[in-house]
């Protein structure tokens, strides 16, 4: 009978897994991560709208938006939160210790306070790191310019991921007789000026 259809539809909707995807900003590499995640879910039989409901939210670079998005995912009892980039992951971790959180595009998950270790993340959080190996980059740079003596490092000092890479670079430089000249920025409008000063 038609009177039961709404209940059946409601039961079907509530049986779907709810996946919240939070992304700090639109960016080609971050968008690729999101799209790849959704494609892989689909390949594994979890097509959006069938067995799973995917709710993608973009914070547009705003920390307050990040917090609000993650609070919504928690209050609506999502089954898993996918957090793309460190700020998204930190916001999600700050809102729940129960809902599983999977992060991507986080350079230093331990230093960012997301997990206790890479080998055994612990708690409700796991994911992948996109750590850049400063020593490997320097080895390549030295292949191109063998007599390099000074390296410029332009980074955002308030971002733990950036600081981690620069610390690795400084350690490599100290061991290999190189000098690191640092230039820090707080926003993208400062990049050109600080880069010129290096």
Can you name each region flagged by the protein language model?
Residues 2-198:
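Short hydrophobic alpha-helices and adjacent helix-cap/hinge residues
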């Amino acid at each position: 009978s038609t009177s039961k259809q709404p209940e059946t539809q409601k039961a079907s909707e509530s049986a779907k897994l709810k996946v919240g995807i939070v992304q700090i900003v639109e960016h080609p590499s971050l968008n690729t991560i999101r799209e790849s995640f959704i494609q892989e879910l689909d390949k594994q039989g979890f097509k959006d709208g069938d067995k799973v409901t995917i709710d993608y939210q973009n914070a547009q670079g705003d920390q307050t938006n990040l917090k609000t998005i993650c609070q919504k995912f928690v209050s609506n009892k999502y089954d898993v939160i996918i957090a793309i980039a460190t700020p998204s992951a930190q916001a999600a971790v700050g809102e729940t210790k129960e809902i599983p959180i999977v992060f991507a595009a986080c350079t230093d998950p331990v230093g960012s306070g997301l997990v206790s270790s890479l080998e055994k993340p612990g708690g409700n959080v796991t994911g992948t790191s996109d750590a850049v190996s400063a020593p490997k980059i320097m080895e390549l740079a030295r292949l191109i310019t063998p007599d390099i003596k000074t390296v410029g490092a332009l980074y955002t000092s308030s971002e733990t991921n950036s600081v981690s890479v620069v610390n690795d670079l400084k350690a490599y430089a100290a061991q290999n007789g190189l000098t690191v000249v640092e230039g820090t920025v707080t926003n993208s409008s400062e990049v050109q000026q600080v880069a010129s000063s290096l």
